[in-house]
Amino acid sequence: MSNKVLSCLISLFLLGAGVAKAQMGDQTSIGPRIGVNFSNVSNIEGSKSLTGLVLGLTSTYSITEATGLTVDLLYSQEGYSLNDVDLRLNYLQLPIYFDLFFGELGDKFRPKVYAGIVPGILLSAKNGDAKVDNDFFNTVNFAVSGGLGFNLRMSSRVWLNTDLRAYLGLNDIRDKSLQDGDKNANSTIQLSVGVAYGLSKI
């Protein structure tokens, strides 16, 4: 199942990017994103925040001068620390956001706020240095997310993007057979930077 979901997420991102380039190039940008996660899991007494890596691709389509749609494809390390042991959950995520931009279209500096959903699948899990069987965890993870940031124009078609995001998991990270009433859901604060390149129509 996880392989099918993984293929679906990647295909959706690539299909969207291809359609954007072919039909909406003048309003579309795409590029790399990298950052850091500060994550934890709810209802685990004594758990502490875990620092992890996030990296991947980001794309934005400008619907109007003030609104847009952002779709990312990200490798995201989440989890928590308990008794000096880190439980790390590595996900492939497809964040989808509706963006609201401030200022004018041609401005060099444009603040933004956004909100959306984050479907993802579990790629692997580690408890300390030991790999943990994925069967102990929920393969599919959903979250709601919001954030703020700014886009800084570096040239006519290149932008530096800085983002601060919050993720709130909607489902238990554990497999259904291990759930006992109190939901253990991911919660993450993410700080990232990216470079977006404007596409031209074919």
Where are these regions (language model features)?
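Gram-negative (and chloroplast) outer-membrane scaffold detector with strong preference
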Residues: 24, 28, 61-129, 202
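Outer-membrane beta-barrel proteins
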Residues: 18, 40, 63-65, 98-104, ...
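Outer-membrane beta-barrel translocator domains and adjoining extracellular loop/strand segments
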Residues: 42-48, 81-86, 124-132, 173-179
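Short glycine/proline- and aromatic-enriched beta-strand/turn motifs that initiate or cap beta-hairpins
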Residues: 21-61, 196-202
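Outer-membrane beta-barrel "beta-signal"
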Residues: 33, 95-99, 185-202
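Transmembrane beta-barrel strands of outer-membrane/channel proteins
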Residues: 32-38, 71-75, 98, 113-121, ...
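Residues that define the transmembrane beta-barrel architecture of outer-membrane proteins
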Residues: 26-30, 49-53, 88-94, 109, ...
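Cleavable N-terminal export/targeting peptides
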Residues: 1-26, 200-202
